């Protein structure tokens, strides 16, 4: 039975239709020709498939070109994309001043050489299905509506536009308030010698809300990047840097719980490598497990290796369509790692090889044997076991600004080794090792909890807490009441203060007695007069942000989330906590204790989230 699935006002409608006369019939239709889509189309055409590319914008490359994100952030090397990158560098030296423009031109050349048909300024407005197998598309173009038939469709729209129309299930945003990562706008600049790019992070935006997106675009284009910069601004890039959108529910996902439990897929298509790169500083409102890692153990900037399953790009219960882009099937925590340019280039190759095997063998995507795909990916270097490097410390520079070699993290397995690490300013690995070791670590940690050494005892308190023991609660309360301002030094960015970490763990443990102190932190106007907020050398952000009280924000955001967690566990405390939220946030005056920046700025957006999240939970109670 043939269906046409369409979306109207955010709702899906599927109706039975006759098989249409397709205006264009191809082996592969690629929707969205950005970082992943342009390469998926090119690699597939090189493999011998007939390919149609459909793009809403007016050039190829997406974020990698029109978005101004020219370079790589970590990732793994190897694969067919490296030849393209090498050509781009040569093209740039000969013809353009930047790699973004060179990549646009080179990709256009490759498309023409490989006879890839391209529809620019085109939008998908319907999906044809034979039961749950995608067989074609309805596309709105400048020339009118075209009916496209394809043996396989790839949704590379970044926001799962096509699969959403088809009726596939997807997720979006963080659990606390549905918001996504902050967006950026990239600027082309000139420092008197070289051309380059810089970016400004803004607030969060729901790109599926046309009014909100328009407001975000206008605001971003009104801001000039001035803080800490000495260069001439030449241009703004045409598209916003949206870091997050929908994520499909796939046949096999990659998740943070699996990663931390050392459970890896048996069928990877490549290995992703980066930190859980959450932009913004309100990580208090992310998942508890991410909080354990990034706040409770202070390891947020450690790099992780994610084995990405090949079926993470196959929507659950659907056939004939792949999603090789940012919308692939990973959980939200992992998505902040598996989204970098190298990842998108590798997933493009994996999808092109998978589609090629299916078309040439005359089978469905599910019928393609993984070993055949694996052989292709290993041959090109896209998939290498040497890329499976676990957890590492990377991106560290010395005083001369030289990049130091990355080092592998070796977790502690002998409890007697805890003290040596806990007494340092870098106890994070010991704290997480305790979680991995389990109750076997507890006797040693309880002994260290009574150490006369301040670092040892306080860091042991975090390690005891990660094992869900309440034995360290009195010391955690003491750290909060002191507003312990010691900043750990495990990471190259986003290190935490002990006072904030103590608040986090008291919330995770559901401590009733700390509630009055936390309410005082969020309600007392004189809180900002404490010494911890006056120290100029304390900085929890990646860079100094003028007119933003970042340390105060960390204490308040952790307190809000801790109160929510305690309220979820203790119904009798909910009225007291709810009153605290009302006293803290009902008046707009609270906003100006943090910043005077616009509500659409990154900082303003985070401050507004304090109120929104607090009231959302209180209203549910």
Residue ranges and their predicted role:
Residues 408-422, 444-446, 475-480, 517-522, ...:
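Buried hydrophobic core positions in alpha-solenoid tandem helical repeats
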Residues 131-137:
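Short, hydrophobic/aromatic-rich segments at coil-to-beta transitions
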Residues 2-9, 15-25, 43, 49-50, ...:
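Conserved N-terminal/central alpha/beta ligand/cofactor-binding core
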Residues 32-35:
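Glycine-rich Rossmann-fold phosphate-binding loop(s) that bind the pyrophosphate
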Residues 3-14, 19, 63, 140-141, ...:
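Flavin (FAD/FMN)-binding glycine-rich loop and adjacent Rossmann-like elements that form
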Residues 405-407, 424-439, 443, 447-450, ...:
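Structural detector for internal amphipathic alpha-helices that build alpha-solenoid repeat scaffolds
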Residues 476-487, 519-534, 579-594:
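Amphipathic alpha-helical segments within extended alpha-helical solenoids and repeat-rich scaffolds
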């Amino acid at each position: 039975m043939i269906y046409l699935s369409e979306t109207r006002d955010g709702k899906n409608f599927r109706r039975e239709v006759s098989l249409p006369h397709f205006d264009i019939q191809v082996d592969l239709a690629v929707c969205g020709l950005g970082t992943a889509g342009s390469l998926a189309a090119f690699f597939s055409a090189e493999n011998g498939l007939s390919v149609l590319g459909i793009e809403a914008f007016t050039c190829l490359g997406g974020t990698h070109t029109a978005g101004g994100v020219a370079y790589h952030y970590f990732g793994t090397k190897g694969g067919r994309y490296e030849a393209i990158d090498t050509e781009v560098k040569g093209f740039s030296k000969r013809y353009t001043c930047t790699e973004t423009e060179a990549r646009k031109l080179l990709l256009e050349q490759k498309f023409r050489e490989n006879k890839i048909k391209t529809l620019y300024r085109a939008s998908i407005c319907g999906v044809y299905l034979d039961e749950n197998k995608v067989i074609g598309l309805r596309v709105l173009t400048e020339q009118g509506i075209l009916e496209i038939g394809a043996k396989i469709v790839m949704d590379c729209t970044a926001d799962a536009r096509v699969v959403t129309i088809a009726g596939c299930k997807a997720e979006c945003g963080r659990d606390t308030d549905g918001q996504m990562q902050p967006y950026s706008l990239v600027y082309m600049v000139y420092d008197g010698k070289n051309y380059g790019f810089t970016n400004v992070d803004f607030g969060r935006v729901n790109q599926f809300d046309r009014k909100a997106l328009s407001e975000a675009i206008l605001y971003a284009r009104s801001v000039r990047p001035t803080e800490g910069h000495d260069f001439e601004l030449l241009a703004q890039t045409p598209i916003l840097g949206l870091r997050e959108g929908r994520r499909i529910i796939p046949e096999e996902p990659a998740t943070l719980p699996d990663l931390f439990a050392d459970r890896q897929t048996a069928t990877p298509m490549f290995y992703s490598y980066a930190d859980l790169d959450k932009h913004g500083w309100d990580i208090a409102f992310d998942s508890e497990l991410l909080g354990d890692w990034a706040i409770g153990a202070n390891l947020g900037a450690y790099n992780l290796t994610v084995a990405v399953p090949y079926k993470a790009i196959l929507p659950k219960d659907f056939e004939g369509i792949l999603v090789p882009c940012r919308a692939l099937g990973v959980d939200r925590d992992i998505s902040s790692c598996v989204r970098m340019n190298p990842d998108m280039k590798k997933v493009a190759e994996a999808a092109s090889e998978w589609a090629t095997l299916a078309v040439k063998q005359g089978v469905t995507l599910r019928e393609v044997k993984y070993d055949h795909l694996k052989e292709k990916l290993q041959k090109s270097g896209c998939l290498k076991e040497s890329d499976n490097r676990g957890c590492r410390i990377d991106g560290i520079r010395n005083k001369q600004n030289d990049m130091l070699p990355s080092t592998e993290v070796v977790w502690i397995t002998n409890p007697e080794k805890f003290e040596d690490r806990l007494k340092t300013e870098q106890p994070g690995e010991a704290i997480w090792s305790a979680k991995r070791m389990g109750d076997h670590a507890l006797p040693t940690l309880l002994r260290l909890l009574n150490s006369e050494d301040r670092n040892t005892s306080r860091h042991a308190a975090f390690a005891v807490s990660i094992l869900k023991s309440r034995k360290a609660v009195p010391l955690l309360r003491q750290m909060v009441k002191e507003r312990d301002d010691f900043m750990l030094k495990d990471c190259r960015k986003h290190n935490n203060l002990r006072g904030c970490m103590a608040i986090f763990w008291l919330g995770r443990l559901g401590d009733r007695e700390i509630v009055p102190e936390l309410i005082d932190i969020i309600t007392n106007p004189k809180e900002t007069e404490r010494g911890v907020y006056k120290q100029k050398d304390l900085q929890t952000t990646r860079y100094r942000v003028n007119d933003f009280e970042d340390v105060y924000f960390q204490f308040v955001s952790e307190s809000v989330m801790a109160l929510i967690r305690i309220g979820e566990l203790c119904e009798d405390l909910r009225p007291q906590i709810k009153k605290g939220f009302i006293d803290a946030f009902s008046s707009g005056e609270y906003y100006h204790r943090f910043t005077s920046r616009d509500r659409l700025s990154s900082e303003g957006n985070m401050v507004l989230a304090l109120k929104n999240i607090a009231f959302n939970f209180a209203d549910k109670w």
